[in-house]
């Protein structure tokens, strides 16, 4: 059933569609096409453009991977790593470090990913450490 439909589209409908297209005999004939004729040509030209792009895409230059950008642009730039430690009385666990570089695989908990980021970019971002306040 599916192959019959596909065969009908390829053998009957596609040739009939191509015969009805208003393709001019010369390049100058494209200037004389009306708006409705251009609209009838648009799907065909779109498919041709897509096929052309897919044909040349393997030969196009690859995009360069963008270098990591700095996260901390101005806070405590004189320190090698910005780490803030906050004492909280109601904290259930003794100490927890939260990520501020957005690169942690265990986000929101810090896993030390900022160290590699800092090496690559020269940044000084570090975690936010919450510590249980000793009463």
From Swiss-Prot:
Pfam families: MitoNEET_N, zf-CDGSH. It is found in: Endoplasmic reticulum membrane; Mitochondrion outer membrane. [2Fe-2S] cluster binds at residues 99, 101, 110, 114. Its main location: endoplasmic reticulum. GO terms for cellular component: endoplasmic reticulum membrane; mitochondrial outer membrane. Its cofactor is [2Fe-2S] cluster. Residues 1-37 are lumenal. This is CDGSH iron-sulfur domain-containing protein 2.
């Amino acid at each position: 059933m599916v192959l019959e439909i596909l065969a009908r589209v390829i053998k009957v409908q596609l040739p009939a569609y191509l015969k009805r297209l208003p393709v001019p005999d010369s390049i100058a004939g494209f200037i004389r096409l009306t708006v409705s004729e251009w609209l009838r040509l648009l799907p065909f030209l779109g498919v041709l453009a897509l096929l052309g792009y897919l044909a040349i895409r393997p030969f196009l230059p690859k995009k360069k991977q963008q270098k990591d950008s700095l996260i901390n642009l101005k806070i405590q730039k004189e320190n090698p790593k910005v780490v803030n430690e906050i004492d909280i009385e109601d904290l259930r666990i003794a100490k927890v470090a939260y990520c501020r570089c957005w690169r942690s695989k265990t986000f929101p908990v810090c896993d030390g990913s900022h160290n590699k980021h800092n090496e690559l970019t020269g940044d000084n971002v570090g975690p936010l450490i919450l510590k249980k306040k000793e009463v």
